[in-house]
Amino acid sequence: MSFEVFEKLEAKVQQAIDTITLLQMEIEELKEQNNTLSQDVQAAAGSRESLVRENEQLKEEQVVWQERLRALLGKMEEV
């Protein structure tokens, strides 16, 4: 009877070891996913900064063109 108890205990220990091993593998996969996502976030932040700078530049160019257009319209009204 004690041998049966020992076998049951051994099976439970083995099951616990298997579960721990699977969880460790899952943790490693999640760490890799986390690293990939972190890199994606950094890349997106860099792209965002670039787009913000480009947007500001385009706004400045728009203001310049609007001023030129107003000047031309003013000259046309004078004629």
UniProtKB/Swiss-Prot annotation:
Q: What is this protein called?
A: Cell division protein ZapB
Does the keyword section mention Cell division? yes
Q: Which gene encodes it?
A: zapB
Q: What does this protein do?
A: Non-essential, abundant cell division factor that is required for proper Z-ring formation. It is recruited early to the divisome by direct interaction with FtsZ, stimulating Z-ring assembly and thereby promoting cell division earlier in the cell cycle. Its recruitment to the Z-ring requires functional FtsA or ZipA.
Cellular component terms per the entry's GO annotation: cytoplasm
Q: Indicate where this protein is primarily found.
A: cytoplasm
Q: Which UniProt keywords apply?
A: Cell cycle, Cell division, Coiled coil, Cytoplasm, Septation
The UniProt entry's sequence similarity note says: Belongs to the ZapB family.
| One of the Pfam families matching this protein, by short name | ZapB
Tell me where in or outside the cell this protein is found.
Cytoplasm
Q: Which residues form a coiled coil?
A: 4-78
Q: Which GO terms describe its biological process?
A: division septum assembly; FtsZ-dependent cytokinesis
InterPro entries linked to this entry: Cell_div_ZapB (IPR009252)
What quaternary arrangement does the UniProt entry report? Answer: Homodimer. The ends of the coiled-coil dimer bind to each other, forming polymers. Interacts with FtsZ.
